Amino acid sequence: KETMEEQIESDIVTRKLWANPDWYDVDQLREFFTELHERAFVPGGGMRQFGAAMRTPSRVEGLQALDIPTLVVHGENDTLLSIEHGRRTAELIPGAELLEIEGMSHDFVYQV
């Protein structure tokens, strides 16, 4: 998007695709994204981040090599990355614990 205002509105619309409908609050999201972009607005940054994520090689070896206490938190209703992704991540990290949050989607919201 060309302007910060356009990006904020786009972020609000996009968030609706994978947000928990019970916790989707346009005013709260507008405030959140405004604060976020006032700190660091980078036109096109979201698309570059998405492209980088899609081109990243497997993280399996890196996860298996972790040697720190780890809690994987994942929403059971995540439509962007299914709960299986969270389970697999916890399975790959030695000694990791998994916290599956009932009713939560991909967004980590204040209500949780």
Task: Name these PLM-found stretches.
Residues 74, 85, 106:
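Histidine-centered active-site/metal-ligand motif
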Residues 66, 72-74, 78:
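Short beta-strand/loop motif that positions the catalytic acidic residue
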Residues 1-61, 68, 88:
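Alpha/beta-hydrolase
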Residues 14, 81, 108:
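Hydrophobic/aromatic residue at the end of a short beta strand that borders the catalytic acidic motif
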Residues 79-85:
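Conserved alpha/beta-hydrolase "acid-adjacent" motif
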Residues 98-112:
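Catalytic histidine-centered segment of alpha/beta-hydrolase-like enzymes
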